[in-house]
């Protein structure tokens, strides 16, 4: 596709008759599958049957998508109240990660209770997978030319030594923008490496998951400050408020669980 003489990538991957298949969905799906592979591999090593995470994903992913969409729609209600038919249209984005995380955690707690396994054990195993999915998923935002930052010059982007396909895709309606999707994606990939390394440290059960929440939230807080499409509540960026809250809650949970003797088991224990 050409836009203002700057070559750009088409958000539609393939056309199946009258039905377009968007890169956004393909990329999100890829993130889910790779995350599932990573979790089942580690789960088997720690005595968790392979079908446990397959079953969890089949339940948690639809619920997470539902919560992610509900979260987004709630904070953009002024638009969706006037365009109710668009509420279910997620083909071109409009999923809020924090909403999806809330849905996934609720599902995980109920699933673990029903299966008679430790939620914290499942959460620890899944933590790198969740972050990997988020790192990959941000490239769906890239294809949709959304979740970007403020205006910049092409010279600025070239100064970051980015490949042309990224620079060109950040050219929207005659203006270049901060590739905030890339900043967050790289931060998340670094977090995946950190979490995989911390598996060998044998942290107390639950603390790998809290480390994920802290790491992701720190990166999201700073990246969100660069974005121009933040969900707002008055003067506050919702994602920044949530990020601060998750860091504080995670630290409190780590301290309280240790003091109350609820974190005696280690990551590698059955």
UniProtKB/Swiss-Prot annotation:
Record-given protein name: Phosphatidylglycerol--prolipoprotein diacylglyceryl transferase 1
Name of the top EC class for this enzyme: transferase
Molecular functions per Gene Ontology: phosphatidylglycerol-prolipoprotein diacylglyceryl transferase activity
List of residues binding a 1,2-diacyl-sn-glycero-3-phospho-(1'-sn-glycerol): 138
InterPro entries listed in its UniProt record: Lgt
Entry-linked PROSITE patterns: LGT
GO cellular component, one term: plasma membrane
Lineage summary: Bacteria, Bacillati, Bacillota, Bacilli, Bacillales
Family: Belongs to the Lgt family.
Coiled coil: none
UniProt pathway annotation: Protein modification; lipoprotein biosynthesis (diacylglyceryl transfer)
Sequence intervals crossing the membrane: 19-39, 56-76, 92-112, 116-136, 178-198, 206-226, 236-256
């Amino acid at each position: 596709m050409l836009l203002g003489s700057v070559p750009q990538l088409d958000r539609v991957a393939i056309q199946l008759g009258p039905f377009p298949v968007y890169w956004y969905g393909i990329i999100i799906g890829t993130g889910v599958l790779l995350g599932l592979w990573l979790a089942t591999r580690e789960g088997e090593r720690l005595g968790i049957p392979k079908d446990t995470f397959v079953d969890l994903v089949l339940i948690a992913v639809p619920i997470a998508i539902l919560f992610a969409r509900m979260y987004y729609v709630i904070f953009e209600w002024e638009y969706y109240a006037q365009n109710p038919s668009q509420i279910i249209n997620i083909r071109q984005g409009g999923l809020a990660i924090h909403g999806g995380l809330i849905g996934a955690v609720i599902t995980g707690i109920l699933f673990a209770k029903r299966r008679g396994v430790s939620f914290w054990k499942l959460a620890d195993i899944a933590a790198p997978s969740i972050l990997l999915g988020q790192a990959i998923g941000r490239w769906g935002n890239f294809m949709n030319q959304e979740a970007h930052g403020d205006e910049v010059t092409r010279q600025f982007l070239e100064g970051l030594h980015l490949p042309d396909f990224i620079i060109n895709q950040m050219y929207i309606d005659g203006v270049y923008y901060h590739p905030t999707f890339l900043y967050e994606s790289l931060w998340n990939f670094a977090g995946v490496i950190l979490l995989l390394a911390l598996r060998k440290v044998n942290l107390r059960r639950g603390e790998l998951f809290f480390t994920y929440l802290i790491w992701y939230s720190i990166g999201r807080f700073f990246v969100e400050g660069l974005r121009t499409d933040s969900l707002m509540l008055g003067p506050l960026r919702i994602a920044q408020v949530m990020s601060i809250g998750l860091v504080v809650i995670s630290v409190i949970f780590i301290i309280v669980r240790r003091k109350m003797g609820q974190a005696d088991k280690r990551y590698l224990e059955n």
